């Protein structure tokens, strides 16, 4: 998810006009309340985009967290200007002394997850000068990217705007995940949520090239019943994955992952036995197993959040790409290599291993927030989420079947087109999916990687109560 999406690019004159307006309004407030302290609050963002629908929502969340602080200072007046193209501005007039309010604002800035994205300007009528952070005993503001002095980095131009936007998006994603609470659930509740992910995915229709109740897609060796049999056969494995995480002691999480991997090897045999040798859920055995184990580990002592679960996943799978796909660890015989290994050699695409190392960011940062925002019935919400995922990943299953990594760009185009015509909410969008399904069947294409990511998304959505 890009939090700057939908924002208007400003020119220099618009920025300067807003700065002049703010200074003038601050002076008016100081003249009206000569003994009070004036604090202006706005987003502190680099570049020409200062607001967007998503940034507006984030700003309001921060203000909700900041409001109790100002209430403790006794609010005399509050003025909000939230719909400006230069970004929302809020002014608080409070009692108290300038030094104290400034210290409180800096403390909030440094303690809040998004405090660094705020511009908190504190002043009063009788102050001789603005108080600096250093005069109040605080270190200079640090750069978001490298941790060095922020003023130095700005002056020297040490970082690109793209790097700045990327870091801010990362901060906002982490903040959203910290707010998504996963309660402590029973083993059966977590396992049932995982099974729901697999069963909802195969029940969803129409899905380009994938198996659903009315079509085998591009898979001649499987039906919806094959997937149901496979899902049920994996239930004991999901229970074992939960027990591994729930009972594991200590912080050597790669060892916990090793235990899970051994269980996964046994689970694959159970899957093949149930499907007469057909690979229905090999990807889910890997990724869903990791997620179930991580949830069980993170909730051993009580509730947790998605940010913590993502950290557990990354710690479990640290150096996985290097360990599995490094030059000295790859199988030399091409016949013995997996599709993922061959694609890493040919295209340098790390696939699901790379996603796991990063804590499944496509699911955590894109798919789950997107699903939570969707309206309509369950089928519509999940179809839209599937196509959102498909347009934002390098689907190794799709690449394998296409024989060329350029298929990813085609998939991006198809995803954009789908949403431009209204997505699953419109007859045109559904017709587009059906036509795409027929084209995929004809070309023997299937987006199995997107399907696996949807399973994970459904699983987490059930846990956080969004589905």
Swiss-Prot record:
Organism domain of life: Bacteria
Signal peptide (from-to): none
Keywords: ATP-binding, Multifunctional enzyme, Nucleotide-binding, Nucleotidyltransferase, Transferase
A Gene Ontology BP annotation from the UniProt entry: prosthetic group biosynthetic process
NCBIfam families registered for this protein in UniProt: citrate_citG, citrate_citX, PRK01237.1
Similarity field: In the N-terminal section; belongs to the CitX family.
Name listed for the protein in its UniProt record: Protein CitXG
Organism expressing this protein natively: Leuconostoc mesenteroides subsp. cremoris
């Amino acid at each position: 998810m890009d939090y700057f999406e939908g924002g208007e690019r400003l020119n220099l004159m618009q920025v300067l006009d807003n700065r002049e307006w703010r200074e003038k309004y601050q002076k008016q407030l100081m003249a009206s309340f000569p003994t009070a302290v004036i604090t202006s609050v706005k987003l502190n963002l680099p570049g020409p985009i200062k607001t967007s629908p998503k940034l507006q929502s984030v700003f309001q969340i921060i203000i909700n967290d900041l409001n109790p602080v100002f209430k403790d200072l006794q609010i005399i007046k509050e003025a909000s200007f939230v719909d400006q193209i230069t970004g929302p501005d809020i002014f608080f007039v409070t009692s108290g002394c300038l030094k104290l309010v400034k210290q409180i604002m800096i403390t909030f800035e440094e303690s809040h997850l998004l405090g660094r994205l705020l511009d908190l300007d504190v002043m009063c009528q009788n102050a001789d000068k603005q108080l600096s952070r250093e005069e109040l005993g605080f270190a200079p503001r640090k750069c978001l990217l490298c941790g060095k002095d922020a003023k130095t980095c700005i002056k020297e131009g040490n970082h690109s705007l793209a790097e700045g936007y990327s870091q801010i998006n990362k901060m906002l994603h982490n903040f959203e995940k910290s707010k998504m609470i996963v309660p402590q659930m029973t083993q059966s509740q977590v396992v049932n949520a995982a099974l729901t992910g697999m069963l909802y995915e195969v029940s969803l229709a129409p899905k380009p090239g994938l198996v659903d109740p009315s079509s085998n897609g591009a898979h001649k060796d499987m039906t919806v019943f094959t997937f149901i049999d496979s899902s049920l056969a994996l239930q004991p494995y999901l229970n074992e994955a939960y027990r591994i995480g729930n009972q594991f002691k200590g912080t050597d999480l790669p060892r916990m992952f090793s235990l899970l991997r051994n269980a996964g090897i046994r689970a694959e045999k159970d899957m093949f036995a149930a499907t007469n040798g057909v690979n229905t859920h090999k990807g889910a055995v890997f990724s869903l197993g990791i997620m179930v184990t991580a949830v069980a580990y993170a909730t051993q002592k009580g509730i947790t959040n998605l940010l913590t679960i993502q950290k557990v996943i990354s710690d479990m799978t640290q150096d996985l790409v290097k360990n599995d796909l490094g030059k000295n660890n790859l199988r030399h015989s091409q016949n013995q290599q997996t599709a993922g290994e061959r694609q890493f050699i040919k295209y340098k695409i790390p696939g699901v291993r790379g996603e796991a190392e990063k804590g499944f960011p496509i699911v955590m940062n894109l798919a789950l927030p997107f699903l939570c925002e969707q309206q309509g019935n369950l089928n519509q919400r999940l179809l839209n989420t599937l196509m959102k995922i498909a347009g934002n990943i390098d689907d190794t299953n799709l690449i394998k079947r296409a024989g060329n990594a350029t298929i990813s760009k085609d998939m991006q185009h198809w995803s954009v087109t789908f949403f431009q015509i209204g997505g699953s909410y419109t007859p045109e969008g559904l017709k587009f999916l059906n036509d795409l399904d027929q084209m995929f069947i004809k070309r023997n294409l299937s987006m199995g990687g997107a399907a696996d990511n949807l399973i994970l998304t459904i699983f987490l959505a059930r846990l956080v109560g969004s589905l």
